[in-house]
């Protein structure tokens, strides 16, 4: 027979002893709580990269990219401050083919206009590098980087440095020989990496916008089919951006200014004249514009198919994300057609390039929603 216990009996001895706090738990919690601060810093970088892409486009459209003929990452931060400094820079520019074959007779004032565009473009690159360095090393020293994110954030700095080197590699292609502009394939490399960096930052911002545990739970209900569709859209959009850079690099947008045909035919004229034949895909204005058109049509068709598939999703936010993808793809096609019909003036051209930025971001957002759906209640409120 068991021994009776008083209802007033002390029970403290029967309770389990409290476990000691594990070292580092508070530190890990603080680092997890820093996701918001890191996210704000990434938003700053995102905005700067968007501006950088726009300034880079305007630098190209104003034919300013070859106005600075030296690569001085540190000393170049200080612009010419005296008449002697300006005379030296102008003399360097007058020694390259662009001046001798295209801009001979340019005044100092005209040179200063294009110089400031290129200097501003490079200076903005320095600002982006500084913002990255201050943020990354500041978070690193104060141990505010969320677990698992040090390598990802460091990668952004590495890619930024690589982008600067590619930028000079691009400029160097137009300083010798008979080149009047930078090599179009180098321009495509430079712009392509800029969009890759932008997309990476955008993805990081979205991931840090939700707690890690929420992401792990949401991934269980992810929609693999829509993720695959978004991957196809990302790939096609990347190809289209590179083709757009080739179009811009050789002014192919002004070669054929009719639509839907090209000089009255489906195919451009004399499209295989260059030797070896592969050069036509990069240097023949007609073929480059034709390829840009065809991939644009394909991107829209695939986008509409993926949008149609997204109608079956049980998640409202996922469907809305793909709605916006369909809208921007259609809008970009219309904007591209208007740009061609107007012989690619700088206003329409820069708007079309900005549309590409929005397109990439909306496709990434749709992919994120498909991979990490947001659950909603029956009333439509986010759960």
Swiss-Prot record:
What is said about its interaction partners and assembly? Interacts with CtaB.
Provide the primary localization. membrane
Name of the molecule in the record: Heme A synthase
A Gene Ontology cellular component where this protein is annotated is: plasma membrane
Cofactors named for this entry: heme b
User: What stretches pass through the bilayer?
Assistant: 38-58, 127-147, 153-173, 187-207, 230-250, 287-307, 321-341, 344-364
Species per Swiss-Prot/TrEMBL record: Dinoroseobacter shibae (strain DSM 16493 / NCIMB 14021 / DFL 12)
Which UniProt keywords are listed?
Cell membrane, Heme biosynthesis, Iron, Membrane, Metal-binding, Oxidoreductase, Transmembrane, Transmembrane helix
Stated EC number for the protein is 1.17.99.9
Residue numbers binding heme: 292, 352
Bilayer topology term? Multi-pass membrane protein
Its annotated function is as follows: Catalyzes the conversion of heme O to heme A by two successive hydroxylations of the methyl group at C8. The first hydroxylation forms heme I, the second hydroxylation results in an unstable dihydroxymethyl group, which spontaneously dehydrates, resulting in the formyl group of heme A.
Say which enzyme class the record assigns: oxidoreductase
Pathway-wise, it operates in:
Porphyrin-containing compound metabolism; heme A biosynthesis; heme A from heme O: step 1/1
Q: Name one GO biological process term.
A: heme A biosynthetic process
Q: Which gene encodes it?
A: ctaA
The record's subcellular locations are: Cell membrane
